[in-house]
Amino acid sequence: TTKQVITEKVIIEKVTPKKVITKQVITEKVTTKQVIAREVITKAETLLNKKNPVLVAVEGRCASGKTTLASVLQDLAGWSVFHMDDFFLQPWQRTELRMQTAGGNVDYERFLAEILEPLKKGETEIVYRPYQCRYQKLAKPVYIKAKQVCLMEGSYSCHPALWDFYDLRIFLTVSPQEQKRRILARNGEDGYMPFAKQWIPLEEQYFKAYQIEERCDLHFTLC
């Protein structure tokens, strides 16, 4: 699938010293990612008029473009970004009961304690240890400065234990066919199988159990 490009007309009004209004039409090409990002930024800036900080969640299906959108938002608006991938379960946490529980496939307790609760308290520097899948252990602490808008990116970011902390919740979706194509392109045939057999079914179980998609504020399909 090629990137969808939209021609957008921006009208700029200028007032001269003689109070004559002149209009200049600027045409620029923007991708759907940028269009979506601008809509999200507008929503967040409106919320900033009422509270600070504003906490935004980007939830959705794997390979739907969550990380890509988060990167665009960070580039355009300078938001702080926190990734749910840094909060995978450690081996000792992956009990049979935990993995059978909808939404249990992430350490939401640690995400709550180390990210969301400090942000809600107004802490300006967040410290946490990302989980390293390669080594199956936590890495050294990282330090992230909390901006006026903080974005939580990744599947399970809208888990019921985390839901009420957010001011804006975004859901990204993708068709099964496009999802498979993207994962194959990114991870190869061998890398696709764990997604097909485990990760995608766990996500869909979680979405259905808590009606995550239906309850989110904004919904997008990212090209």
What positions do the PLM features span?
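Small-molecule kinase domains that catalyze NTP-dependent phosphoryl transfer to phosphate-bearing small molecules
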Residues: 159, 188-223
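Conserved nucleotide-sensing/catalytic segment adjacent to the nucleotide-binding pocket
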Residues: 93-136, 149
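Conserved lysine of the Walker
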Residues: 66
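Short beta-strand-centered segment that lines the nucleotide-binding/catalytic pocket of NTP-utilizing
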Residues: 79-92
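Hydrophobic positions on the alpha1 helix immediately C-terminal to the Walker A/P-loop
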Residues: 69
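ATP-dependent NMP and nucleoside kinases share a basic, alpha-helical "lid"
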Residues: 136-186
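P-loop (Walker A) phosphate-binding loop of NTP-binding proteins
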Residues: 61
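Extreme N-terminal, non-catalytic leader segments
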Residues: 1-3, 28-55
